[in-house]
């Protein structure tokens, strides 16, 4: 994905999303200026402010333009207490995730400095793995319902949807990623000992696909055991693939190993196709407008996007600059520094120019 102009839809969203995306955009504009990358940034006025102003959530014509003209989407964060039903957030997030079939939620869990590692006897080098979370199926699809609500006989059901197609493609993506990045081991985390139908499918398909990658070690782990191992020895993991629900849980545990959500980038990816990239953290309304938000997750996310667009050398470069910002304390308070959001962005951009 390297030929021609790359149009990037930019959706800052709500709360601190607008502040961290501003710094991500500055990084992109600097890369474009210095390296001559054919990038076109399309800034979209979507979020809680727009919804409260005129009721707009995610217009169909905007989605169609994204689908047909863009190479990537950079999203900040969505969520605002003035919109308790999250109507705008649901339309934007689900519209992109399902409309673009972004079936891989890819979450690098990389600790970039020893001082950020919370585990006794471990260092940053012990935490470097990537989680592939299935992103379009599972218990989050919303199948189910309630019966006799508000009574002593109330029943609530959520159904866990797993298709062979959905399971196989995210597992295959994890193996392909391991091959492409020189990793040697892929774990699949499930609860097939308890979820004997849905996760038996995961178990069976994982080892069927693994036969196509004899150069890789394919290992199964129950997700509860994985949580134990993550706080004992995270170095045992290189690539992990799991379902939607479990991926949501283990990646937040992973964020605790890398310095918090302010250090966690992510991609919602359809391999080889238009994909969406966002920092993991939320909109954090209490922090909005105070220049306190950590933009480094967004910088790392921009790096992931550059790899997706065909320039992996820029992800490596941005990762090293983030490492340098942490090492030199040119960072926000959540990771031990004293700088504000804008000043951290200034530091990263300055180092790019340096």
Regions found by a protein language model. Give the residues of each.
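Glycine-rich phosphate/diphosphate-binding loop of Rossmann-like nucleotide-binding domains
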Residues: 9-26, 30-32, 151-224, 236
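Buried hydrophobic positions in well-ordered alpha/beta secondary-structure cores of metabolic enzymes
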Residues: 14-17, 71, 132, 174, ...
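Buried hydrophobic packing segments
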Residues: 24, 28, 206, 298-306, ...
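N-terminal beta-loop-helix "entrance" segment that forms/cooperates
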Residues: 34-60, 228-230
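Glycine-rich phosphate/nucleotide-binding loop
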Residues: 50-52, 229-330
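N-terminal glycine-rich phosphate/adenylate-binding segment common to multiple enzyme folds
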Residues: 51-157, 245
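Short acidic loop-to-helix transition motifs that present clustered carboxylates
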Residues: 114, 221-228
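Glycine-rich phosphate/pyrophosphate-binding loop and the adjoining helix
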Residues: 142-188, 192-196, 317, 321-354
């Amino acid at each position: 994905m390297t030929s021609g102009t790359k149009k990037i839809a930019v959706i800052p969203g709500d709360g601190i999303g607008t502040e961290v995306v501003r710094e991500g955009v500055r990084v992109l504009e600097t890369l474009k200026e210095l390296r001559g990358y054919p990038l076109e940034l399309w800034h979209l006025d979507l979020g809680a402010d727009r919804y409260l102003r005129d009721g707009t959530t995610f217009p169909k014509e905007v989605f169609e333009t994204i689908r047909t003209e863009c190479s990537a989407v950079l999203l900040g964060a969505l969520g605002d207490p003035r919109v308790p039903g999250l109507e705008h957030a649901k339309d934007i997030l689900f519209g992109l995730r399902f409309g673009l079939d972004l079936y891989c939620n890819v979450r690098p869990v990389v600790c970039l400095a020893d001082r950020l590692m919370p585990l006794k006897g471990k260092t940053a080098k012990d935490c470097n793995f990537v989680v592939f979370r299935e992103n379009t199926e599972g218990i989050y699809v919303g199948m189910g319902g309630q019966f006799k609500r508000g009574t002593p006989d109330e029943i609530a059901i959520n159904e866990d949807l797993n298709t062979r197609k959905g399971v196989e493609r995210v597992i295959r993506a994890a193996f392909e990623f391991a091959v492409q990045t020189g990793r040697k081991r892929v774990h699949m985390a499930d609860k097939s000992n308890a979820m004997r139908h849905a996760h038996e499918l995961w178990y069976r398909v994982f080892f069927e696909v693994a036969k196509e990658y004899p150069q890789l070690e394919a290992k199964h782990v129950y997700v509860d055991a994985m949580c134990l191992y993550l706080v004992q020895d995270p170095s045992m993991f290189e690539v992990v693939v799991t379902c939607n629900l479990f991926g949501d849980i283990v990646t937040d545990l992973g964020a605790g190993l890398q310095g918090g959500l302010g250090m966690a980038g992510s991609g919602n990816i359809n391999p080889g196709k238009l994909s969406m990239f966002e920092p993991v953290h939320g909109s954090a309304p209490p922090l909005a407008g105070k220049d306190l938000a950590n933009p480094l997750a967004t910088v790392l996310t921009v790096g992931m996007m550059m790899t997706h667009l065909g320039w992996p050398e820029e992800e490596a470069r941005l990762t090293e600059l983030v490492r340098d910002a942490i090492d030199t304390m040119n960072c926000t308070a959540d990771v031990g520094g004293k700088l504000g959001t804008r000043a951290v962005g200034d530091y990263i951009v300055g180092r790019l120019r340096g």
